[in-house]
Amino acid sequence: MKWGFRWYGEGDSIPLQNVRQIPGINGVIGTLLNKLPGDIWELAEIEELKQSIEKEELTLLGIESVAIHDAIKAGTEERDHYIDHYIQTIKNLSACGIHLICYSFKPIFGWAKTNLFYENEDGSFSLLYDQAVVEGMEPSEMYTLIHSQSKGFKLPGWEEERLKKFNQLMETYDGVTEEVLFDNLAYFLKRIIPVCEEMNVKMAIHPDDPPWEIFGLPRITKNLSDLKKYCLLLTLLTMD
């Protein structure tokens, strides 16, 4: 097993010089914060990220994440266009020597927290999710809450360019049940798995965070039963 520290690029408040001093760290898990779901990650951008890490004598172990466009997750008529973009990104990452991609298949909210700077009893800070807070708000208020705590930092999965169309996104998922969402995941994986095998790229799915439905949006990696179903799907797809 290799240990990687997540790093958000040159704008990260934790410089790579500090990351390098963490005992046992083999490298970093990086991202390109300027990329929106559906964008192609270009070779030059990936190489620039990789070189910025390697010049600090660290290794870019993988990417978290290459976000999946909502058209793919909701199964709209545009999904094949964005899957083609995703496939090109897989090829470009592989060409740069990056063979691990983390991803999630959650509608709209890639992750959800109600407090980004919760102070613990020992004075340390952590993320916090409080279901009672969520139950008392409208879905659109979740973005406002996260944005107000971000201190100007661009958060993956909470891109202003995407979430300012929040009501439109909610309509996109109208009628998308857990079964439909899972079928759309299967469609996506069926298209990318042959490319991943050819490019020697491993895909690592992130479980639901939190591990239950929020705002009526379906979740399909929320418990052991879901993950067993997911693993069975992978087995069937790789047998073809």
PLM feature segments, named:
Residues 37, 67-84, 109-123, 166-176:
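Surface-exposed, active-site-proximal loop segments in enzymatic domains
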Residues 39-45, 75-92, 181-188:
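Glycine-rich anion/phosphate-binding loops
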Residues 3-7, 26-30, 60-64, 101-103, ...:
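Hydrophobic faces of well-ordered beta-strands that scaffold small-molecule active sites
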Residues 50-61, 94-162:
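Glycine-rich, aromatic-flanked loop segments that form ligand/cofactor-binding clefts
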Residues 32-47, 109:
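Glycine-rich, proline-tolerant flexible connector loops at the mouths of alpha/beta enzymes
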Residues 9-11, 34, 66-67, 105-109, ...:
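Active-site-proximal loop/turn and secondary-structure-junction residues that shape catalytic pockets
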Residues 135-141, 145-240:
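Acidic/histidine-rich catalytic cores of soluble enzymes
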Residues 16-24, 41-61, 91-95, 193-200, ...:
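Acidic (Asp/Glu)-rich catalytic clusters
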